[in-house]
Amino acid sequence: MNRSPLALVIPVALAMSAATATAQATTGTADNGTRFNWNGTVPAGAWIIVRNMNGSVSVKPSTGRTADISAIKRAERGGDLSMVRFTTKPLANGGMLVCALWGDNSNCDEDSYHSNNNGNHGRRNNVEVEFTVSLPSGVNVKVGSVNGDVEVAGATAEVSATTVNGDVRAVSSGGPVNATTVNGDVRASMRALGSGDLRYTTVNGSIQLDLPASLSADVELRTVNGGFETDFPMTLTGRVSPRRLSGKIGNGGRELRASTVNGSITLRKSS
């Protein structure tokens, strides 16, 4: 997989309560230099946020109210494991932010992620971090990487999943689910929509969305080299174009936007 430039800044925004962050009922953190683990009680409605730069992020359902976030570091071609560290920060309403940071001049908070993948003397530090998250029912999750696949399975609330070089696959029985990448496919599935608009983007890849049959939305789909396919009856608006499809599903309302350059876009009814 091709790597991104050595330094990057990714602005991110997440609407959250302004309430003072509260400590989890039970927490534990361990970092032995190669493996990292955090576990704690996270209430429904709170957020778990995980940010990575090189490596995958995988989310699976947990049992009970205890969340578990673990990571393993792997060095390639002389990578320095000691130059990659983990940070944790309690969030409002009992949530948690966990970040993997490369280099001394990196930082991470709720609103931004800056990680500089340089080792000694400006040389690239070839270390990958693989995150695994066990997610309690009703907890929202925001996970992201730069070079790596992102997968969310068995979520029951809101999901935001992003990467740059890799595929994104996200499934939630709740919603909404939003997903973006640049070089990779997007697959998103939800049985409920929650509130808010829906956004899906890639450049080199296809987009497939499995959506509730009751969907009502104002839809805009865009591609350059690809096509459109939908299971939903749509009232078209504007000029019909092989590169752009806009219209209304059901009664309209929320916005559903999906765009790619090289790939197709498919809307399917959830089974």
Question: Can you annotate each of these PLM segments?
Answer:
Residues V9-S17:
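Bacterial N-terminal signal peptides
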Residues A21-R51, S56-G144, A153-G154, S160-T162, ...:
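Acidic (Asp/Glu) and glycine-rich low-complexity loops/linkers
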Residues V150:
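Short, small-residue-enriched loops and turns at beta-alpha junctions
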